[in-house]
Amino acid sequence: MIKAERQDKVRQLLEEQGTVSVKEISDALGVSDMTIRRDLEELASLGEIERVHGGARSAQNRPHAMLRHEYSHSEKRTKHAEEKLQIARRAVELIEEGSTIFLGTGTTVEQMASMLPTFRLRIVTNSLSVFNLLEAREDCELCLVGGMYRRRTAAFVGPTAEDTLRALGIDAAFIGANGILDGDVSTSNMDEGRIQQLAFSKADSRYLIADSSKIGKRDFYTFCRLDNLDAVVCEPDIDDGDRAAIEEHTQVIC
């Protein structure tokens, strides 16, 4: 197993368990303790993890942690899958027949797209994945916002996408995020963040679609404030403290 594969596996184990010992990682990957220690030291130097006695813990488990690693589209599909399903089911209940809806990028929004009611809708999206899910739906009028293609998230971004969005009227926007902290909503990429910011500014109703693992985290680019949103759609069993943190700024829908 090459170093990049080992370190990806280490990130995955820490994401799932929070804290992992050197022996646990060594056994899981079938490599020596010394190799794992070198990997952990390198990841710690990048700020992705924290070294603890005998192992490591995820840096993202600290309160107010800065996200250091942007997960790929395929990696995100496997994380918090049940929560994403619950959020998507609740979010589609907010959609009204005949409305123009913006669906952003992200795996939770894709779950929404797969559950859309079978009535007439106009869907605007910069997500190739959302477009592919809906292109056979005859009851959905589709507008794919083109531009520069960002493969990591299957998203179209850049000036062309922004110019297209500026010309459109949107009834409701449903957008995901990587971090929610102190009322700020953030994502990992500035170009994607500008699209999300613009889509919210054009929408009459603005909904953030995010599971509670995003709360207390921040990422590189802040694209909106919770105070400017109509609601955050979360999973039903959100922690009381997390709910209270959001409700200081806007409504929580579960």
Segments predicted by a language model, with ranges:
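Short glycine/serine/threonine-rich phosphate/pyrophosphate-binding segments
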Residues: T108-M112, I215-R218
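Catalytic nucleophile loop
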Residues: T107, V124-L128
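HTH-adjacent hinge/linker in prokaryotic transcriptional regulators
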Residues: I2-K9, L13-A28, M34, L40-F102, ...
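Conserved phosphate- and dinucleotide-binding cores of soluble alpha/beta proteins
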Residues: I2-Q12, T19-K23, G30, S45, ...
